[in-house]
Amino acid sequence: MEKSIESISSSTLNILDNKNYKKWDNETVCKWLLNNIKTIQKVSIEIFQANEIIGKDLEFLTDKILLKMGVGIRDILNFKFEYQILKNCYNNNNNNNHITINNFNYNFNNFKININKDLLKVVVNAPIININEYQYIETISKNKFCEIEKYKKSQTKVNEYIIIKKIIKNSTLNEEKLINEIDTIYLLDHPNLIKIIGYCKDKNYFYIGMKYYETFKFKQSNISKFGKNFEQVIRKISFKILSAIDYLHSLEPPIIHGNINAKNILLDNENNEPILIDFGLSYKSIDLLTNQKTQFISPCFITPEYFYKKTKNKISKEADIFSFGSTISNMIKGGTDFKEDEEGFEELKRTFAGVLTSRDKVSFDYRSLFTEINKDEPCFRPSSKELLKSFWFVEPPQPSFKTSEITTNLLIYYLKKYGCYIIRDGVAMVSLNFNENIYSTSSIIGSEFSHQPKINEKHKYFKEINQFYSKILSESFQAKIGWYLLNLNNEFKDKPYFKNIFLSFSTSDKLEINSVADLNLKLTIFFYNSITMSLIYQTIYQKPKSFKIVDYL
């Protein structure tokens, strides 16, 4: 058999000539390449045998390494299966030194491979468990695709429980994909994700063993025992679950959970940690041409894009985020099930609208967070990484100092980091970031102007403009920057010249108005973005102690 055809790149030669074996992680393979410069792009078992290269020496030869060694993408595609075969054969061989080649038949030009399938057993890290060592206790749940059962290890004095997920074998199940999925999840390393112990199979089922965790039911009776601290408890649970979701979404390729709800959050009593369960293993291993993967999505949290746009795909990062936000609200409400139809979807909307209006029960920061998560358009929902930075999750310890210690620099720091919420009657009207230009000019605005702003009282819409201003200030009007709250009603009352500025600009030719609807839109933008923020900046600069430390709830 021919041993060489093409040369490797000059950069690779430099590495090999310098014998920088640590960079390639394997001295044996590098020595072989030094002696056989032209053998990298087509190899055979005989070549590896002749150079005493065994299976474990091949484990580091990933696509990334091969690309660095000068192998082109086309060549990688042509022989990547051959490398996998060689690695699997050596790894599965007891001696790792002897292997037959009678069952291999190569055709590189046509990219055809005929091999003995017995040599291609998938090598996985997840161990094989003996189901006979465990005693069946009870069935926790079941559907037409799988069953979840509780088992106890036999012949032990201590009660050692595990969960067995039995996946039914059928014509649509791709067993190789399922085993790969098991191995992928077995290798996941996050304290808030369920741990796979191992697996086994028989002619009817795949058995997947997982650590047993207690179920914490988010019912109103359980939530109420925390009293006024219930939101903090749920926030801590939610943050840890979100970190697990972010871990899954950050993998390459990402893992989409697809089934986030309170029922899939368990409790590890040993570490008092929430555990996210039931991701993968339910839809990834099923043929994508079937609709079985959708059967595992909880009808509790149908996404708006699925309900309104009738999209067939319920599985996405954005859908996970929507379900996560819905799960938090569902926990706060004490747990509710919803039907997968129009009536159930409308009930879901009413329930979560109730969360947003329960101002005596949930914090403003959560209501603001949920509003962002609950966007109808998936592209407008925050990512898991963005959520982890939100104030509701990462708020610093509540300040222990007095209001007299609030300074301009402190408020500017929080403003730059978290932005400013303009709150009207308990509802966030707008969230604004720090604006250097407005801040630098706000300090000079005041009654000491040499002339008062000119107001055109004969303006066509002067009455409506004046009513707009009065209506806003007739309701509770606040600004929130981190932990600090400013009563805007009082500030506008103390600074009447801001009203004059508002009326002057609104009745000038600078604000082109074509209709009453157009008037309200432009007045709203101008009032919140310019007038209100100017007043806030001036207060930060001149009277920072006007801000008060607000309680969490």
Curated annotation (Swiss-Prot):
GO terms for molecular function: ATP binding; protein serine/threonine kinase activity. Gene3D superfamilies: Transcription Factor, Ets-1, Transferase(Phosphotransferase) domain 1. ATP binds at residues 140-148, 165. One of its GO terms (biological process) is signal transduction. Keywords: ATP-binding, Nucleotide-binding. It comes from the Eukaryota. InterPro entries: Kinase-like_dom_sf (IPR011009), PAK3-like (IPR051931), Prot_kinase_dom (IPR000719), SAM (IPR001660), SAM/pointed_sf (IPR013761). Residues 24-90 form the SAM domain. Residues 134-393 form the Protein kinase domain. The protein kinase domain is predicted to be catalytically inactive. PANTHER family: SERINE/THREONINE-PROTEIN KINASE SAMKA-RELATED-RELATED, SERINE_THREONINE-PROTEIN KINASE SAMKA-RELATED. Belongs to the protein kinase superfamily. Ser/Thr protein kinase family. This is Probable inactive serine/threonine-protein kinase samkD. It comes from Dictyostelium discoideum (Social amoeba). The lineage of its organism: Eukaryota, Amoebozoa, Evosea, Eumycetozoa, Dictyostelia.
